[in-house]
């Protein structure tokens, strides 16, 4: 399940950058990419919940990582909304980067992640 989760969030990030790029160019198919992106949000959340459910003893850090993961998805939607409205998205991009960094740090720190820290 770990590989499915990692694959889903990697594809989600790629689709996010593609959606932002297409929105900036005013491409008509940007809406389709955003809908596929939202499908991958759901897939990422479901695989994350399945991973969380498979842990025997869930510490507070796992719940914090789950909340940080939801924060990443929320920040992605805020960036896309700002880009669509033509508003400045600098603060939203900063929020997304911070949320992603926190989530990746916790993911690598916890036992289900890789042994980097």
From Swiss-Prot:
InterPro entries: UPF0344 (IPR010899). It comes from Geobacillus kaustophilus (strain HTA426). The keyword Cell membrane applies. Pfam families: DUF1516. This is UPF0344 protein GK0697. It is a multi-pass membrane protein. Keywords: Cell membrane, Membrane, Transmembrane, Transmembrane helix. It is found in: Cell membrane. The chain crosses the membrane at residues 1-21, 39-59, 60-80, 97-117. GO terms for cellular component: plasma membrane. Belongs to the UPF0344 family. The lineage of its organism: Bacteria, Bacillati, Bacillota, Bacilli, Bacillales.
């Amino acid at each position: 399940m770990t590989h499915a989760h990692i694959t889903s969030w990697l594809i989600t990030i790629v689709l996010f950058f593609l959606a932002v790029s297409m929105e900036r160019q005013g491409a008509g198919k940007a809406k389709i990419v955003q809908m596929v992106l939202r499908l991958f949000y759901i897939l990422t959340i479901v695989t994350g919940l399945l991973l969380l459910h498979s842990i025997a003893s869930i510490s507070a850090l796992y719940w914090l990582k789950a909340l940080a993961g939801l924060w990443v998805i929320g920040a992605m939607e805020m960036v896309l909304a700002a880009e669509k409205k033509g508003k400045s998205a600098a603060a939203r991009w900063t929020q997304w980067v911070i949320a992603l960094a926190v989530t990746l740090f916790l993911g690598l720190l916890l036992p289900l992640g890789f042994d980097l820290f």
